[in-house]
Regions:
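Extracellular, beta-strand-rich glycan-interacting domains
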Residues: 470
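Short hydrophobic beta-strand that contains or immediately precedes a catalytic carboxylate
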Residues: 465-466
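Hydrophobic h-region of N-terminal signal peptides that target proteins for export
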Residues: 20-29
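Sec-dependent N-terminal signal peptides
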Residues: 14-20
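Formylglycine-dependent sulfatase
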Residues: 13, 29-454, 459-461, 473-493, ...
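N-terminal secretory signal peptides that target proteins for export/translocation
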Residues: 1-13
Length: 518
């Protein structure tokens, strides 16, 4: 054989072997990566956790926490990095979830509004490379259980082709077809449906399940089965990424049809002044009696979360699993004299739980990191070693280095978080929303909360400004005080810089320049 022939064949073997070796290398790397379990009940405020008043956490938040019972979260907190200042920038279910999944703000994520059948402009489309896409491509088995609520409902019922999944109430619920699932290969989910003891779900193949069981417990049971792989739900040779989206403590919270009776009994006989303890709570509001059911739902969610933690221990996966407990947004629950539980810049609405445990890697502590919704995806990808696979269009920041080492200088700590409120814009002849109205923008720093609201003709309507350090319950709007004009201008300038960076309409359409204080 000539040398040229020999080297030619050697080159051919190399060309064949290289991709094979690459596959083996990728598989080996994936097997070494940690599992991820991400649990996020809806509408649970940061103050609705018992441990804030316990030794080691007292004084970490500068206002009174709720008198709730959360024994599992309490134990988990002692093993976790607990953020005191995580923010839901657009504190509504769908916009937050859009940011969570894509790492982008609502103006870019495709989900600027709460998803329903009148808002085709707000939906998690197949285009953006999402968190689960990256995880799946990196060799993860990906599972989604529970509430999704990021898609525009269409007439795509698997059981009744050409019909909505809820023909009597077609506005909200949605079925997610397989091609829209962004890498999730295990599926037990629905859009949004607020009958907590009468939930329904669609599985991988579009089969509908109606378990007639309080939804967080049902979801936790299936999360446990997925973790233990009882029915071959996942590929055991791969690390797994599991998201569990629980609906409670989201409303309704009016009766025992909304929560577990055993949890309600913990609060049933307590007077309102022992439950609504925050200094900005109005116990005369009609909603006040709901607090017992809301707290009962929080305690029930805690029990469901405990089931998931127990399964990880049983499976011996505690040490190699990153576990997050957080929420979409908060709940005002009679604070600020508003019936709207969310969508406002108040701390009860924006400030959400964010607890993350990664044994042997993250030192348990509290941290005041101003984490924003779009930061979660890149940060979590960073923690599993996928820094280089964060999509280039991601607007959030990878803060994984700060979770691993709070003194790290790899990335600058954020000094502010945006507040975003969008509303329906123009509608077509069929009543479908064709654009959104950017009703308010604001900024939250470690000391101040500011929000600027506009009218439909793009004039300044109102400015809110709170000194959260000296007025933690945000009882006094100090925006009209002449001595605070300079402060408002400074905060507005900082907000404008961020809005320009993310190409928000308040920057691109010149709205902020028009309504800012001169």
């Amino acid at each position: 054989m000539s040398n040229s022939s020999f080297f030619s064949k050697l080159s051919m073997l190399k060309n064949v072997a290289t991709p094979i070796l690459s596959v083996f290398a990728t598989t080996a790397a994936a097997q070494q990566r940690p599992n991820v379990v991400y649990v996020f009940p809806d509408q649970m405020r940061n103050y609705a956790m018992e441990f804030w008043s316990q030794p080691g956490f007292e004084g970490s938040v500068n206002s009174q926490n709720d008198p709730v019972h959360t024994p599992n979260i309490n134990r988990f907190a002692r093993e976790s990095v607990v953020l005191t200042s995580a923010q839901s920038n657009c504190p509504l279910s769908s916009p937050h979830r859009g940011s969570l999944l894509t790492g982008m703000y609502p103006n870019k994520s495709g989900v600027p509004l709460n998803c329903n059948s009148s808002r085709p402009i707000s939906s998690w489309l197949t285009d953006p490379v999402s968190w689960s896409d990256v995880m799946s491509q990196a060799g993860y088995d990906c599972g989604y259980i529970g509430k999704l609520h990021v898609q525009f409902p269409t007439k795509n019922s698997p059981q009744n082709p050409g019909e909505y999944v809820e023909t009597q109430r077609p506005v909200w619920d949605a079925y997610t077809e397989p091609q829209q699932r962004h890498g999730f290969n295990y599926w037990l989910s629905y859009g949004t449906f607020d009958e907590h003891k009468n939930p329904h779900y669609w599985d991988n193949n579009g089969n509908r399940h109606d378990p007639h069981e309080w939804s967080p417990i049902y979801e936790a049971k299936h999360a446990v089965s997925y973790i233990l792989n009882r029915n071959g739900e996942r590929d055991s040779s791969k690390p797994f990424f599991l998201m569990v989206g629980m609906n409670p403590p989201h409303s309704p919270y009016r009766s025992l049809t909304d929560c577990m009776e055993e949890d309600y009994n913990l609060y049933a006989k307590q007077p309102l002044d022992q439950l609504l303890v925050r200094k900005n709570a109005n116990r005369e509001m009609r909603k006040a009696e709901s607090v017992r059911y809301y707290f009962a739902s929080v305690t029930g969610v805690d029990r469901a979360f405990g089931m998931i933690l127990d399964a990880l221990r049983e499976a011996g996966l505690d040490d190699n699993t990153i576990v997050v407990f957080t929420s979409d947004h908060g709940e005002t629950m009679c604070s600020q004299n508003t019936d709207d539980p969310k969508n406002s810049p108040y701390s009860e609405s924006m400030n959400v739980p964010f607890l993350i445990r990664y044994k042997g890697h993250l030192t348990p502590r509290t941290d005041n990191l101003l984490l924003s919704s779009p930061d979660i995806m890149p940060t979590m990808l960073g923690l599993v070693g996928l820094h280089d696979q964060i999509p280039s269009v991601t607007q959030g920041v990878d803060y994984s280095s700060l979770f691993l080492d709070p003194t790290s200088k790899t990335v600058e700590r954020p000094d502010a978080a945006l507040y975003i409120q969008n509303m329906d814009g123009d509608k077509d002849k069929d009543g479908l929303v064709v654009n959104y109205f950017p009703a308010a923008r604001g900024l939250k720093t470690h000391r101040y909360t500011m929000a600027i609201y506009i009218t439909r003709d793009y004039k300044r309507k109102e400015i809110l400004l709170f000194d959260d350090q000296n007025d933690p319950y945000q009882l006094n709007n100090i925006a009209d005080k002449p001595e605070n004009r300079k402060l408002i201008k400074q905060l507005t300038k900082r907000m404008g810089k961020i809005l320009k960076e993310i190409e928000d309409p308040w920057a691109t359409e010149g709205i902020l320049a028009k309504v800012a204080l001169k």
